Structure formats: C-alpha cells, structure tokens
C-alpha cells in the first residue's frame, strides 16, 4: 500500500467524516466502521477527486467501501496518469 496516498486519504476521511485518526485504518468500512451514510460517501469521493486531481466514475465509486480500497483505487489512477 502506498503510504503517501494512504496518509492523504486518511486526512481527507478525517476531515470529511469527522472521525478520530485512529479509526481510519485500511480495513475500516466507510459505512459500518466510520458511520458514513450515502451522502457522506458521495462527498468523500468528491473530496478525494479534488485532493488527487482524478475522476472516479460512479460505478467505480460504488465499489470503494473501505479506506484500503480507496487507497488502492487512487494509487492505480495516480500511477496511470504519471
């Protein structure tokens, strides 16, 4: 897992969902562990798109349900544009 991307994702998640830093771990589920509802998730995806200057289509965003999956997906997008 790309540590730099994880740290940036972690910061966005903490800011967007207002959760404690120690709860943002790769296996944390946005809905179950971080109590994000569907609106929170949409706003989180938008914030991640802005932070990383990428676009995440809705069908891909629906599959991103944990912090680790977000990091993995963003890593692939960032590497593809590098």
From Swiss-Prot:
Locate the O-(pantetheine 4'-phosphoryl)serine modifications and list their residues: 38
Pathway, per Swiss-Prot/TrEMBL? Lipid metabolism; fatty acid biosynthesis
Going by the entry's taxonomy, the superkingdom of the source organism is recorded as Bacteria
Provide the alphabetized UniProt keywords: Cytoplasm, Fatty acid biosynthesis, Fatty acid metabolism, Lipid biosynthesis, Lipid metabolism, Phosphopantetheine, Phosphoprotein
- Describe PTMs of this protein: 4'-phosphopantetheine is transferred from CoA to a specific serine of apo-ACP by AcpS. This modification is essential for activity because fatty acids are bound in thioester linkage to the sulfhydryl of the prosthetic group.
Localization annotation: Cytoplasm
- Per its record, what are the GO molecular function terms? acyl binding; acyl carrier activity
Q: Which Pfam families match?
A: PP-binding
The record's principal subcellular location, in a coarse class, is: cytoplasm
Cross-referenced SUPFAM superfamilies: ACP-like
GO cellular component, as recorded: cytosol; membrane
User: What cystine linkages occur within this chain?
Assistant: none
Q: Where is the Carrier domain?
A: 3-78
For this chain's UniProt record, which GO biological process terms are given? lipid A biosynthetic process
Q: Which family does it belong to?
A: Belongs to the acyl carrier protein (ACP) family.
Function noted in UniProt: Carrier of the growing fatty acid chain in fatty acid biosynthesis.
What is this protein called in UniProt? Acyl carrier protein
Task: Give the species this sequence originates from.
Answer: Gloeothece citriformis (strain PCC 7424)
């Amino acid at each position: 897992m790309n540590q730099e991307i994880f740290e940036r994702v972690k910061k966005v998640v903490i800011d967007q969902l207002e959760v404690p830093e120690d709860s943002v771990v790769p296996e944390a589920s946005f809905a179950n562990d971080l109590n994000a509802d569907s609106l929170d998730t949409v706003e989180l995806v938008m914030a991640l798109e802005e932070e990383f200057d990428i676009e995440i289509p809705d069908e891909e965003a629906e599959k991103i349900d944990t912090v680790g999956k977000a990091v993995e997906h963003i890593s692939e997008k960032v590497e593809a544009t590098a």
